[in-house]
């Protein structure tokens, strides 16, 4: 299985640079797994494809305003820091620009004295471990001085931070949004519940590795980055009970899929727990839990495109993507959505 098997031509103008005005008015392509049929709808029409007894599983991770700008105390030189992962109470794994000048022991100032940072170590991938200190709670200060770490393909500044958060985001820790969830409004979620569909949340903190392209030609040699996940006993019980009653498990986003498939046993039961997952799902993988997926349109040659190809078939997905290009769907984080059922 070669990397080139997951390539497609995407005109740059189809990469969405900003969210549409109303979350649930984005377009929705329906891809049927068992028949050769696609449909073109509006996201709000998702309701028509859900049945009483189904369970919709969402990732309630919240994006941190993880990009902070500061300066070196010693020289006043400007510096940019991107928070990747919390290691301990005060220490974070980060990426620093310019990295070559970020030496161990260097003291950094952010927000005109609101936060200080000390570089204490290097990381395996060329980053830095920074120990932060501030008078107010760390996350509170971060909200004041940080900006959203938008993906590199989005060039337009974000005017409203909340548009890069899902309406149900609860647990801070992601460096990128679980973007399939951006289409849901509180009103649509209420309509889904009223239809007899359960909504269950799990947690997977999205790392920046989600944007890293696969760089090996032999796909099976690719290694995923680790991400923290958590499934509560209550969430596992609700999902397992729904399956026992014959309900379908439909994941919202590839992060929810990775969380569920990591936490399941061979019988397809979801087990509660937490830890780090580097599960890599590509064609040939046998899904144990999910039967459907709400997802966005992904980058060529990406691990996310491979995951949805594992669910619906590579040829079917690439054919659907060609349709999406022809029909001028909007791609990537702020783009349109696909339902695979």
From Swiss-Prot:
Recorded metabolic or biological pathway in which this protein acts: tRNA modification; tRNA-queuosine biosynthesis
UniProt cross-references to InterPro entries, sorted A to Z: QueA, QueA_dom1, QueA_dom2, QueA_sf
Entries under Gene3D superfamilies matching the protein: QueA-like
Catalytic activity: 7-aminomethyl-7-carbaguanosine(34) in tRNA + S-adenosyl-L-methionine = epoxyqueuosine(34) in tRNA + adenine + L-methionine + 2 H(+)
Keywords recorded for this protein, A-Z: Cytoplasm, Queuosine biosynthesis, S-adenosyl-L-methionine, Transferase
Entry EC no(s): 2.4.99.17
Pfam annotation, one family: Queuosine_synth
Localization: Cytoplasm
GO biological process: queuosine biosynthetic process; tRNA wobble guanine modification
Role description: Transfers and isomerizes the ribose moiety from AdoMet to the 7-aminomethyl group of 7-deazaguanine (preQ1-tRNA) to give epoxyqueuosine (oQ-tRNA).
Protein family according to the UniProt entry: Belongs to the QueA family.
Subunit structure: Monomer.
This protein's name: S-adenosylmethionine:tRNA ribosyltransferase-isomerase
UniProt source species: Desulforamulus reducens (strain ATCC BAA-1160 / DSM 100696 / MI-1) (Desulfotomaculum reducens)
Protein's gene: queA
């Amino acid at each position: 299985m070669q990397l080139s098997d997951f390539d497609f031509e995407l005109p740059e103008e189809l990469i969405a640079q900003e969210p549409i005005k109303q979350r649930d008015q984005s377009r929705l392509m329906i891809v049927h797994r068992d028949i050769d049929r696609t449909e073109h709808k509006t996201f709000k029409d998702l309701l028509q494809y859900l049945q009483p007894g189904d369970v919709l599983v969402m990732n309630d991770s919240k994006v941190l305003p993880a990009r902070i700008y500061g300066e070196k105390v010693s020289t006043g030189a400007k510096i940019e820091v991107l928070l990747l992962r919390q290691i301990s109470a005060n220490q974070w794994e980060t990426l620093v620009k310019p990295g070559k000048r970020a030496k161990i022991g260097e003291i950094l100032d952010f927000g005109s004295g609101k936060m200080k940072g000390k570089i204490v170590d290097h990381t395996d991938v060329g980053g830095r471990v920074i120990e932060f200190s501030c008078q107010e709670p760390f996350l509170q200060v971060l909200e004041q001085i940080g900006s959203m770490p938008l993906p590199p393909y989005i060039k337009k500044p974000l005017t409203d931070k909340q548009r890069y958060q899902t309406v149900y985001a609860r647990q801070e820790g992601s460096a990128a949004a679980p973007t399939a969830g951006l289409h849901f409004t509180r009103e649509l979620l209420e309509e889904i519940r009223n239809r007899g569909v359960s909504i269950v949340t799990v947690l997977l903190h999205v790392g920046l590795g989600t944007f890293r392209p696969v760089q090996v030609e032999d796909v099976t040699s690719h290694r995923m980055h680790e991400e923290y996940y958590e499934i509560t006993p209550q969430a596992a019980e609700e999902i397992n009970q729904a399956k026992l009653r014959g309900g379908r498990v439909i994941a919202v986003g590839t992060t929810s899929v990775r969380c569920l498939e990591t936490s399941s046993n061979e019988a397809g039961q979801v087990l509660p727990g937490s830890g780090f997952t580097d599960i890599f799902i590509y064609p040939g993988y046998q899904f144990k839990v999910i039967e459907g997926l709400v997802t966005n349109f992904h980058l060529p040659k990406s691990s996310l495109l491979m995951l949805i190809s594992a669910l619906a078939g590579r040829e079917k997905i690439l054919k659907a993507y060609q349709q999406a290009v022809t029909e001028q769907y909007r791609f990537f984080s702020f783009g349109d959505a696909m339902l695979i059922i």
